[in-house]
Amino acid sequence: MSSSELLTSSYDFTLPEELIATQPANPRDSAKLLVYDRASDEISHVHFYDFEKFIPKNCALIFNDTKVIKARLFGQKESGGKIELLINRALDAHNIHVFTRGKVKIGTKISFGLELFAKIIELLEDGSRVVNFYKNDSILRFEEILPIIDKIGHIPLPPYIQREDNKDDEIEYQSVFAKEEGAVAAPTASLHFTKEQHERVCTKFTHAYITLHVGSGTFKPVECEKILEHTMHSEYYDISDRAKELLDSKVSILSVGTTSTRTIEFYARNKEHQRGEANLFLHPKNKPLRVDHILTNFHLPKSTLLMLVASFVGVDKAQELYKIAIEKEYRFYSYGDAMLIL
């Protein structure tokens, strides 16, 4: 391994702004798909509706069934000042980690309508906050908040999509098999599946679901030059019994997305824990142990997601594939095109 693989600057690249996808492919499976076969070093340029043709025989697919919540809320302080709040994750039953746009201090009360309000209970060093939510002065559990914010909240589009969310995003920024509420970012490789294609794949191939509630940390770039000094964010995961059975067997695994991959690989290193908090950082010096193939989108420069891709192919090959994708005008990021690494 070259020392450059451990430098954040090695994962930088220049992306033309017009290749940042701000709208999804329509239909979903019309997105382009770059297929890279490591054994033959061959690259194929197809569309996602061709995905099934490239799935290796006797391979099991693992999907992330997390569901994006309407985590972006607009409220008002008692002083009358407006404030934006982004739910990041539940720390426990009542304490919710959030980001706020606007100054708040401990004790600040923020009203959102429908008798829902939040109270700031802790200010964290990174500028984020911990809050409790209430309705009619009764403190709410996280699962009690969800049906309320589903009525008044907004889909939290990624920061690089420079537009307001709309009704279409409530459908498009969600996989067709999303089930377990809790994510504030979509597992984007999953977005390419239509309902029909997902059903066909699941009929033809062994499969299972894990849950990883994707947090906003997924968009955070690595800011230190030595990647081994980066502190990885933590997210809640749950390995279903069926997924555990497959992962504990010898079957070849195709992971749908980086979130499924992080979950599978965390479990491979911590088999005594079927659910809990995962904070695994995959990179060329910490390669996958259990995942054989990965379906993924094209990611941000200097991101842990690009470093995860490099854990499969190395940083030089990752940069080569990304250069080809840019030349071929693949669309990047959450609503963009896909890559399958075999």
Swiss-Prot record:
| Subunit structure, as described in the record | Monomer.
Spell out the GO cellular component terms annotated for this protein, sorted alphabetically and separated by semicolons: cytoplasm
Q: Which gene encodes it?
A: queA
An annotated Gene Ontology molecular function: S-adenosylmethionine:tRNA ribosyltransferase-isomerase activity
What general EC class does the enzyme of this chain belong to? transferase
Using the UniProt record, give the first listed, main subcellular location: cytoplasm
Protein biosynthesis as UniProt keyword? no
The protein, known as: S-adenosylmethionine:tRNA ribosyltransferase-isomerase
InterPro entries, per database record: QueA, QueA_dom1, QueA_dom2, QueA_sf
Q: Which reaction does it catalyse?
A: 7-aminomethyl-7-carbaguanosine(34) in tRNA + S-adenosyl-L-methionine = epoxyqueuosine(34) in tRNA + adenine + L-methionine + 2 H(+)
Listed EC numbers? 2.4.99.17
Compartments in which it is found: Cytoplasm
Q: Which family does it belong to?
A: Belongs to the QueA family.
Q: Any idea which UniProt keywords this protein has?
A: Cytoplasm, Queuosine biosynthesis, S-adenosyl-L-methionine, Transferase
Q: In which pathway does it act?
A: tRNA modification; tRNA-queuosine biosynthesis
Q: What does this protein do?
A: Transfers and isomerizes the ribose moiety from AdoMet to the 7-aminomethyl group of 7-deazaguanine (preQ1-tRNA) to give epoxyqueuosine (oQ-tRNA).
Record-linked Pfam families:
Queuosine_synth (PF02547)
Q: Name a single GO biological process.
A: queuosine biosynthetic process
